[in-house]
């Protein structure tokens, strides 16, 4: 499925997310685990994961539930700061990025998430949800550049 950022595409994407989230466990995580296993089998070495929006939520869940990862970097993970997700504990180092002006993820929930995960690196940016995507109106170049710089340094430190 290839979707853009027009309102109709966003609506279709949300519908697909709802459908996939309704699958019985492990749902999409089994595909992520297969990808991790494939990288280990074919390349060896350490594996990191990064995801944006719903992919950020899946990145968080992967850090908590899957095997074979060495680092995770979720960006504005939609649903990641709920009580249920905050109760999970990561198995690997996590660096998370959130937008201070996100209409879907409140700063109160980010603060609670940060308090629940004191060893995780949590950064916020004066931007909107989707600030890292230069195909969206929410793109914010300075925040995106800083988040990228931090993420690359984080992966270098944890993946080598």
Q: Which sequence ranges carry the predicted segments?
A:
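N-terminal cap/leader regions of alpha/beta-hydrolase-fold enzymes
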Residues: 1-160
């Amino acid at each position: 499925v290839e979707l853009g950022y027009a309102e109709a595409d966003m609506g279709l994407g949300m519908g697909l997310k709802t459908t996939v989230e309704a699958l019985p466990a492990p749902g999409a995580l089994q595909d992520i685990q297969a990808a991790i296993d494939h990288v280990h089998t074919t390349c060896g070495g350490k594996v990191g994961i990064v995801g944006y929006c719903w992919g950020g939520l899946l990145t968080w869940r992967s850090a908590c539930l899957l095997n074979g990862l060495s680092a995770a970097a979720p960006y504005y993970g939609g649903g990641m700061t709920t009580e249920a997700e905050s109760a999970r504990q990561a198995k690997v180092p996590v660096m998370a990025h959130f937008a201070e002006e996100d209409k879907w993820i409140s700063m109160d929930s980010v603060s609670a998430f940060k308090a629940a995960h004191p060893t995780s690196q949590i950064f916020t940016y004066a931007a909107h949800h989707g600030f890292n995507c230069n195909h969206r109106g929410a793109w914010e170049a300075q925040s995106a550049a800083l988040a990228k710089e931090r993420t690359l340094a984080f992966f270098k430190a944890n993946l080598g």
